[in-house]
Amino acid sequence: MKKIEMYHHKKVLVLGLARSGVSAATIMHKLGAFVTVNDQKPFSENPEAQGLLEQGIKVICGSHPIELLDEGFELVIKNPGIPYNNPMIEKALKLKIPVITEVELAYQISEAPIVGITGTNGKTTTTTIIHHMLNTHKENSSLLAGNIGFPASAVAENATSDQYISMELSSFQLMGVETFKPHISVITNIYEAHLDYHTDRSEYVQAKWHIQKNQIADDFLVINWDQEELKNLTKQTKAQVIPFSTTQRLGQGSYVQNGNIMFNDEVIGERDNILLPGEHNLENVLASVAVAKTLGVTNEEIMHVLETFKGVEHRTQFVVEWQGRKFYNDSKATNILATQSALKGFKNPVVLLAGGLDRGNSFDELLPFFKNVKTLIVFGETADKIGRVGKIAGIEVHYVDNVEAAVPVAYRESAPGDIILLSPACASWDQYRTFEVRGNAYMDAIGELIEEVEK
């Protein structure tokens, strides 16, 4: 960790805890700042706050008292989930107190260069692929951080100059950066999202675009050339632009030509050898290849990762091939768009498992994507709604109680060569606490099925 002096004896307010807040407070304390932590959760139910108090950090829990800002703070580090229209943030900005997010602190203390990845879709998968490619090239050369579950500042604290930090970044995090500068920035794509947090689409796009705002001519920006909006924005960057495209033969950057993954006119390997299915994953692959080639990863090392990487858990994750059937876990598909993307990725017949929390959708938008679906197995609050669309498509529909009950039915109704896909198109909360719990239930049920059949 860089021993920076800029925060020594500064009064710093960390607003909102969770893992990133705990990490920011702890590091600021080590840097000699006078740290106060404020979190809405009551102290008695807040083990994180209790741990910080034991370190000698001032802790205020149970509410966000706006008068706290009258205590002369010189900096606010906010949890990325707290919006800028929060009264505490509005008052801090009115008082001209700088407001940053924890990734800004991570950059300031990091000895390791950062590969920053943002976008509406594909951030986690792309970040993970890049991480694996760099570590295949040189063991322990990449550390995983950011919105992926490891606080950026905690990772940066222990990173060394011969490593890279592969950092997933949300628009929430990027809105609060001032000096943050990745050596390589990646923007996978931009669609409508988080308009409950951002005032409008323009603010959302600008938050994503912040990832490159401090880059210079020695840095790189890997960007989706299939999106005209992003292509036009590259006129504003000082970084070296590396495009990627799933639809165009670019001749530079990464793209597909004659069934091959290409980079700057060089064949990296065959597209058909990639384990991850789908056009959306092809975007993630091409962005990752651009980063890997820029950092000296060999074609053999790149293809080793692409031929073996099963996907991030619960995101069109390949589970197992058994009895000629391939099982995929896409429990993260908590909306219709995500299930559409998953279905587009398969050419073989699909047995689809879908259903969950009813948010008032009709699911008619799934109809054009049911061309390869041979059987539909539905469960949860939306079983009847999704089943109705399946019947309109002329698909055989089976109604079951839950994901666990769906798995043996899917096996019975499938044949060798089929895809068995959990892609619910709904949130899990009607039956499962999280989409992870639902995905794990699916994978456990597959294991039990295999054990039962092979007895």
UniProtKB/Swiss-Prot annotation:
<comment type="similarity">
    <text>Belongs to the MurCDEF family.</text>
</comment>
<dbReference type="Pfam" id="PF21799">
    <property type="entry name" value="MurD-like_N"/>
</dbReference>
<keyword id="KW-0547">Nucleotide-binding</keyword>
<keyword id="KW-0963">Cytoplasm</keyword>
<dbReference type="InterPro" id="IPR036565">
    <property type="entry name" value="Mur-like_cat_sf"/>
</dbReference>
<dbReference type="GO" id="GO:0008360">
    <property type="term" value="P:regulation of cell shape"/>
</dbReference>
<dbReference type="Pfam" id="PF02875">
    <property type="entry name" value="Mur_ligase_C"/>
</dbReference>
<comment type="pathway">
    <text>Cell wall biogenesis; peptidoglycan biosynthesis.</text>
</comment>
<dbReference type="GO" id="GO:0005737">
    <property type="term" value="C:cytoplasm"/>
</dbReference>
<dbReference type="GO" id="GO:0004326">
    <property type="term" value="F:tetrahydrofolylpolyglutamate synthase activity"/>
</dbReference>
<dbReference type="InterPro" id="IPR005762">
    <property type="entry name" value="MurD"/>
</dbReference>
<dbReference type="GO" id="GO:0008764">
    <property type="term" value="F:UDP-N-acetylmuramoylalanine-D-glutamate ligase activity"/>
</dbReference>
<keyword id="KW-0132">Cell division</keyword>
<dbReference type="GO" id="GO:0071555">
    <property type="term" value="P:cell wall organization"/>
</dbReference>
<feature type="binding site">
    <location>
        <begin position="119"/>
        <end position="125"/>
    </location>
    <ligand>
        <name>ATP</name>
    </ligand>
</feature>
<dbReference type="GO" id="GO:0051301">
    <property type="term" value="P:cell division"/>
</dbReference>
<keyword id="KW-0573">Peptidoglycan synthesis</keyword>
<keyword id="KW-0961">Cell wall biogenesis/degradation</keyword>
<dbReference type="GO" id="GO:0009252">
    <property type="term" value="P:peptidoglycan biosynthetic process"/>
</dbReference>
<comment type="function">
    <text>Cell wall formation. Catalyzes the addition of glutamate to the nucleotide precursor UDP-N-acetylmuramoyl-L-alanine (UMA).</text>
</comment>
<dbReference type="InterPro" id="IPR018109">
    <property type="entry name" value="Folylpolyglutamate_synth_CS"/>
</dbReference>
<dbReference type="InterPro" id="IPR004101">
    <property type="entry name" value="Mur_ligase_C"/>
</dbReference>
<keyword id="KW-0133">Cell shape</keyword>
<keyword id="KW-0436">Ligase</keyword>
<keyword id="KW-0067">ATP-binding</keyword>
<dbReference type="InterPro" id="IPR036615">
    <property type="entry name" value="Mur_ligase_C_dom_sf"/>
</dbReference>
<dbReference type="GO" id="GO:0005524">
    <property type="term" value="F:ATP binding"/>
</dbReference>
<dbReference type="Pfam" id="PF08245">
    <property type="entry name" value="Mur_ligase_M"/>
</dbReference>
<dbReference type="InterPro" id="IPR013221">
    <property type="entry name" value="Mur_ligase_cen"/>
</dbReference>
<keyword id="KW-0131">Cell cycle</keyword>
<protein>
    <recommendedName>
        <fullName>UDP-N-acetylmuramoylalanine--D-glutamate ligase</fullName>
        <ecNumber>6.3.2.9</ecNumber>
    </recommendedName>
</protein>
